[in-house]
Amino acid sequence: MNNHIQTAISEQGIEAYLHAQQHKSLLRFLTCGSVDDGKSTLIGRLLHDSQQIYEDQLKALESDSQKLGTTGEKLDLALLVDGLQAEREQGITIDVAYRYFSTAKRKFIISDTPGHEQYTRNMATGASTCDLAIILIDARKGVLDQTRRHSFIASLLGIKQFVVAVNKMDLVEFSQEVFERISAEYREFAKKLSVDTIHIVPVSALDGDNVVNPSDKLAWYQGETLLSLLESAEVERELERHPVRLPVQYVNRPNLDFRGFAGTLASGILRVGDKLAVLPSGKESTVTRIVTFDGDLDYALPGQAITVTFADEIDISRGDLLVDAARKPLVTQNLLAHIVWMGEESLQPGRVYDVKLATKKSRGQVEAIRHRIEINKLDELDASELKLNEIGLCELSLTDPVAFDPYQEIRDTGSFILIDRLTNVTVGAGMIVEGLAAKVATGHYSEFEVELNALVRKHFPHWQALTISNDASKE
């Protein structure tokens, strides 16, 4: 057992300790930056200096540092995080590594994401659930293209809080001038990003300067340490202020006397007595019970797995979205979205993919790529396809109407994945910007052709027939 935890349990008792842990706030954050900026070392330093390493881990780390370490006689703290053998042997991070730790003030989940451009998809995966991003910058190199790329992706994935850690300050003799030059350059670049708060902090992860404890070598820096910034960062409460969104995962009917609809509340505070609408059908009813494994609730918060029952018998199935009847999202078959392409084969407009948005499954295709984003310079370039790890702004059409919110407002109902229909492999991740109007083909059509078109679109949506209208009928 970890000595820090053992001491806490002996002082408080096991029940009091577990109760305190359960009620601490949780911050999810990721570390990202250029290759070999020290991401894994920084996480190892956080774990080590906050006394979150178990005795057996420490012994294994001492042994591994002698065999695989890159820090001489010192502990190579990066080995705490670089779990894959390929990563350890190469001294780089490839996969997204998750780590958990806590302090007296807060619990943390860390995503250590790869710095290489060919692993952009891995980084997007790690960023999608985080509240805050730590952007590492090598004090010797300053702001690089990879720094800009990671900052842009984190912003695109909805992260609003950045902590920029200017690392390896020991290699520039803890120079205030170097730190201030890098700070000014990064803040100028960050004006292009959709970020609410940016803190910039000088650190040396190798020796622990200003990571957990203040350093005399950085006496000119008057701000907080890195850990202090993480402990004081605002945990995202915005979801509670948004309207209720509950994607239906399955219909719960254990007997003839009970019929509930189960799912994880995506946003809003749901209360017994609330009036909800079912989308896309639009039917409405009042919530009579909120049921959980531990019993009934008067209200539910975002992230809770619940089952709701209604006053009326209405048709609801998996994939439907239960929403605040007074604050409904848009429903459409046409979307504008940023897509991060994760497939080995390029994204080709016109090819049909399976689409999963929350619990809703449909089929769809990219009608057009408006532009590809050159993620190192943030330039918008013309493109006819998207290759592995590329990001583009795309027009997407679906076979079924879907209810959605813009991704920057509610992640769960504003994101989707594209699945290859032959291999069942996830090949793309999408963040919805807005809905688009349906495309209409106009011309001279007979009344029969217009009616047949409406019939085909209603009963055979997977044919993806365009809506047609008769010019003469508009005159």
UniProtKB/Swiss-Prot annotation:
Which residue ranges does the record annotate as region G2? 91-95
Annotated metabolic or biological route of this protein: Sulfur metabolism; hydrogen sulfide biosynthesis; sulfite from sulfate: step 1/3
Q: Where is this region: G1?
A: 33-40
- Tell me which residues make up the tr-type G domain: 24-240
Please list the GO terms describing molecular function. Answer: ATP binding; GTP binding; GTPase activity; sulfate adenylyltransferase (ATP) activity
- List UniProt keywords, sorted A-Z: ATP-binding, GTP-binding, Nucleotide-binding, Nucleotidyltransferase, Transferase
Q: Which InterPro entries match?
A: CysN_GTP-bd, CysN_II, CysN_NoDQ_III, G_TR_CS, GTP-eEF1A_C, P-loop_NTPase, Small_GTP-bd, SO4_adenylTrfase_lsu
Output the GO biological process annotations, alphabetical, semicolon-separated: hydrogen sulfide biosynthetic process; sulfate assimilation
> Which function does this protein serve?
With CysD forms the ATP sulfurylase (ATPS) that catalyzes the adenylation of sulfate producing adenosine 5'-phosphosulfate (APS) and diphosphate, the first enzymatic step in sulfur assimilation pathway. APS synthesis involves the formation of a high-energy phosphoric-sulfuric acid anhydride bond driven by GTP hydrolysis by CysN coupled to ATP hydrolysis by CysD.
Supply the name of the protein: Sulfate adenylyltransferase subunit 1
Species of origin: Aeromonas hydrophila subsp. hydrophila (strain ATCC 7966 / DSM 30187 / BCRC 13018 / CCUG 14551 / JCM 1027 / KCTC 2358 / NCIMB 9240 / NCTC 8049)
